[in-house]
Structures are given as C-alpha cells and as structure tokens.
Amino acid sequence: MGTIFHLDIVSAEESIYSGPAEFIVAPAVMGEVGIFPQHTPMLTRIKSGVVRVKAPLQDDEEVYVSGGMLEVQPDVVTILADTAVRGKDLDEAKALEAKRKAEEIMKNKISEIEYARAQAELIEATAQLAAIQKLRKRGH
C-alpha cells in the first residue's frame, strides 16, 4: 500500500495543483470526504468550499473550489473545479465588492437573466467569504 497518491486540481482557467499528496479533505455534496492512498474508487460532485491538501515534505495547502467533480482512483485523485483559487490568493475586498454589486443588481430587479447571473455571483462571493473566514480561523 502506497503512502502517497498523485493529485490534480484543475479549473477551466488553469491547473492549480499537480503533484504528490498524502491525503486530502474535499467538500463533497454529501459532506467532507477524506481521501488517503489506495482509497476505493469514487466519483462525486463537490460543492463550494476549501480542499485541504497534505503534501509530503511541504506545508499544507488550501484551495478554494466553487463546485465541480471529484474522481478518486487508488493512485490518482482528480478535482475538476468550476473555479479554483489557492487559499492564499483569495481576495476578501474583491469578494465583498462582488457581493455588494450582486445584491444591488438583485434589488433593482432587472431582467430574469441578469437576476439569475447576479444570484450566482452572490452565491460565489458568499462562498469565498466563508472560505476566507474558515482559513483565517486556522491561522492562514
């Protein structure tokens, strides 16, 4: 039984992490899941939240994801995220401004399409702010 597996975290924009991991914790829709080497194969949806990565001989890394898919094979784990941002790169001021703008658009009740877009942006900004608070509590 191996002590590490290969992890890829990718979004439509870029590859955020590609390398060895000892374990990860990911925000699956069914609740947080912990993945160790030789885990039973699994395919599940993930929700907005923080993926925690324990890599050998490195500091733990946190990556914010806004949803997507998690595929687990015994020696390879892949996270295909809608959006992925390293925890240290999350911008609280930007998220607060996006939240404020989305709320303002929703108040003005423009078209249904603009309302739906603003609602999605509000959900994204709120999830990023929650991730920032969670990381702050952990001392990052």
UniProtKB/Swiss-Prot annotation:
Q: Which SUPFAM superfamilies match?
A: Epsilon subunit of F1F0-ATP synthase C-terminal domain (SSF46604), Epsilon subunit of F1F0-ATP synthase N-terminal domain (SSF51344)
Which chain positions lie within coiled-coil regions?
none
Q: Sum up the protein's function in the record's words.
A: Produces ATP from ADP in the presence of a proton gradient across the membrane.
User: What family is reported?
Assistant: Belongs to the ATPase epsilon chain family.
Localization annotation: Cell inner membrane
**Do you know which Pfam families this protein is assigned to?**
ATP-synt_DE, ATP-synt_DE_N
Per the record, membrane topology reads:
Peripheral membrane protein
Gene field = atpC
Specify the protein name.
Answer: ATP synthase epsilon chain
The record's note on quaternary structure and interaction partners says: F-type ATPases have 2 components, CF(1) - the catalytic core - and CF(0) - the membrane proton channel. CF(1) has five subunits: alpha(3), beta(3), gamma(1), delta(1), epsilon(1). CF(0) has three main subunits: a, b and c.
Q: Which GO terms describe its molecular function?
A: ATP binding; proton-transporting ATP synthase activity, rotational mechanism
Keywords, ordered alphabetically: ATP synthesis, Cell inner membrane, Cell membrane, CF(1), Hydrogen ion transport, Ion transport, Membrane, Transport
Query: Whose protein is this, by species?
Result: Nitrosomonas europaea (strain ATCC 19718 / CIP 103999 / KCTC 2705 / NBRC 14298)
Would you tell me the Gene Ontology cellular component terms? Answer: plasma membrane; proton-transporting ATP synthase complex
Q: Indicate the secretion signal residues.
A: none
Checking CDD domains in the record gives: F1-ATPase_delta
Q: Domain of life, per the record?
A: Bacteria
